[in-house]
Amino acid sequence: MRVAIYPGSFDPVTYGHIDIIKRGANLFDKLIVAVLLNPAKRPLFSIQERIELLKEVTKDIPNVEVDYFDGLLVEYAKKVNASAIIKGLRMVSDFEYEFQMALVNKKLNPSVETIFLMTSPKYGYLSSSLVKEIAQFGGCLSEFVPDIVAERLMEKFKKS
């Protein structure tokens, strides 16, 4: 079975992420969407909330699983028997960092390949940070995230 990991913070998941998830799922028997648990960051959504939202928005993609990890991605790849890491690239500026990470991951675990998928042009500008900023000021989110994500974002910003 060909298994790949699509890692990220997904805080929150956007249509850009979902685009990469669907395309990655078409390339592998199983795609694990893996939420990074990074204690150095202060995410808007808890790890449980991000997992729940990802499960909801991927429920119609049968070969997608949602999980979380901390530590080294290549160690997680070993644990789940993944042979590939999928990374979405929005623009050239993403490539420099992601290429460096791919080389480090290859050095740490030569059996894991990194596959870069270019973001669909209609999502090239989209980021979770941008979505949070729009939500914070009460802007319309329908072009950026599924309804369930927009609802949760608005709830978060009403509380603050």
UniProtKB/Swiss-Prot annotation:
An annotated GO cellular component: cytoplasm
InterPro entries in alphabetical order: Cyt_trans-like, PPAT, Rossmann-like_a/b/a_fold
Record key words, sorted: ATP-binding, Coenzyme A biosynthesis, Cytoplasm, Magnesium, Nucleotide-binding, Nucleotidyltransferase, Transferase
Site (Transition state stabilizer): H17
Entry EC no(s): 2.7.7.3
Single biological process term from Gene Ontology: coenzyme A biosynthetic process
Enzyme class: transferase
Binding site for ATP: S9, F10, H17, G88, L89, R90, E98, Y123, G124, Y125, L126, S127, S128, S129
Location(s) in or outside the cell: Cytoplasm
Catalytic activity: (R)-4'-phosphopantetheine + ATP + H(+) = 3'-dephospho-CoA + diphosphate
UniProt protein name: Phosphopantetheine adenylyltransferase
Native species: Caldanaerobacter subterraneus subsp. tengcongensis (strain DSM 15242 / JCM 11007 / NBRC 100824 / MB4) (Thermoanaerobacter tengcongensis)
Gene that encodes the chain: coaD
